[in-house]
């Protein structure tokens, strides 16, 4: 399962740079959970932020497990954890804007996670397409005044635009890492590891975005 990633596979951890860089998600996830600057009490984001932090922890641990063991189960968890982030972004957007009741949002998140998990299991080669299908709608929603209550020129929404820019750069580096021209298998500086780090930064910027665009009950 590690054939599409540049870094050389050795003993445990199988891919050192990619394994260690996964802890960027753990670091920022713990930051979200313990931050004293969480969205204010009485806002929907105050309830949503811990779920974001837990999802980031899930991504970090799953990614480490995959790159350390290079097992098919680890690969499944790694991709599935990213699916849950995309789903949280989508259902979280509808919930925090009051377009979807909390209970329905949670039920939709769980049901969609099961469905896409089964799709990933049945069609593993479609994992990148499925990830894009899940991630893009949530990003689009968070870019609109329909969800945030603020126009694109508002200073309140800078974090989601910054997160999108970081994610685009990270994705570009991820693609380059799969090219023989940019692949140095024995190097500790791996494009996939940079993808992990920038992806964690982008996820943390979602937390800042929640904090800057709160919705009171």
Where are these regions (language model features)?
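Multi-pass alpha-helical transmembrane bundles in non-GPCR membrane proteins
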Residues: 1-217
């Amino acid at each position: 399962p590690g054939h599409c990633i540049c870094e050389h596979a050795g003993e445990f951890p199988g891919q050192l740079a990619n394994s260690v860089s996964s802890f960027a998600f753990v670091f920022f996830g713990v930051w979200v959970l313990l931050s004293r600057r969480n969205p204010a009490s009485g806002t929907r984001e105050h309830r949503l932020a811990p779920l974001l932090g837990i999802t980031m922890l899930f991504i970090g641990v799953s990614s480490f497990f995959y790159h350390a063991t290079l097992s098919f189960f680890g690969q499944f968890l790694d991709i599935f954890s990213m699916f849950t982030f995309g789903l949280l972004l989508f259902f979280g957007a509808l919930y925090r804007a009051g377009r979807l009741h909390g209970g329905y949002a949670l039920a939709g998140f769980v049901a969609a996670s099961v469905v896409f998990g089964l799709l990933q299991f049945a069609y593993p080669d479609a994992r990148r397409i499925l990830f894009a299908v899940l991630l893009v709608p949530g990003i689009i929603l968070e870019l609109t005044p329909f969800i945030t209550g603020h126009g694109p020129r508002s200073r309140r929404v800078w974090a989601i635009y910054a997160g999108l820019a970081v994610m685009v750069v990270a994705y570009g580096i991820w693609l380059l890492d799969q090219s023989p021209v940019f692949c140095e298998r024995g190097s500790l500086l791996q494009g996939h590891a940079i993808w992990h780090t920038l992806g964690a930064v982008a996820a943390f910027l979602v937390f800042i975005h929640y904090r800057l665009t709160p919705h009171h009950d």
